[in-house]
């Protein structure tokens, strides 16, 4: 994951994804992470996952796609640190992007609500 200022890479981070890391998130519970253009829509300093910043998934297109399948698109996708009581499980991120706590401090401090985020493989 790259943190950019305009076209300049400020930092690079390794991250973890859910149990189905390939392909765009389609419906709630599919274990995938959204792909595409979104924005940061909230910040949570009291997250169960150290600190977290919310991604604006689902957008209108995501909702329409899931509705066409008769399902919910899911939601509450975040970039976050590790849980306060961390146990490595097969899908502890639930479709979110997880980074180390120290890295999450940097990201949290540098990213504002409204910041665009581009999620691509």
Summary of predicted features, one role per range:
Residues 1:
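Gly/Thr-rich phosphate-binding beta-strand-loop-beta motif of the actin/hexokinase/Hsp70
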Residues 37-38, 42-121:
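Exported/periplasmic cell-wall-interacting domains
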């Amino acid at each position: 994951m790259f943190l950019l200022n305009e076209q300049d890479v400020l930092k690079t981070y390794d991250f973890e994804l859910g149990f189905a890391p390939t392909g765009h998130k389609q419906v709630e519970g599919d274990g995938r992470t959204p792909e595409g253009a979104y924005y940061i829509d909230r910040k949570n300093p009291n997250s169960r996952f150290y600190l977290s910043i919310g991604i604006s998934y689902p957008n209108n297109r995501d909702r329409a796609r899931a509705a066409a399948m008769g399902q919910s698109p899911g939601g509450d996708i975040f970039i976050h640190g590790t849980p306060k009581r961390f146990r490595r499980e097969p899908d502890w991120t639930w479709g979110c992007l997880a980074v180390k706590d120290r890295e999450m401090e940097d990201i949290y401090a540098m990213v504002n609500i409204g910041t665009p985020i581009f999620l691509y493989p």
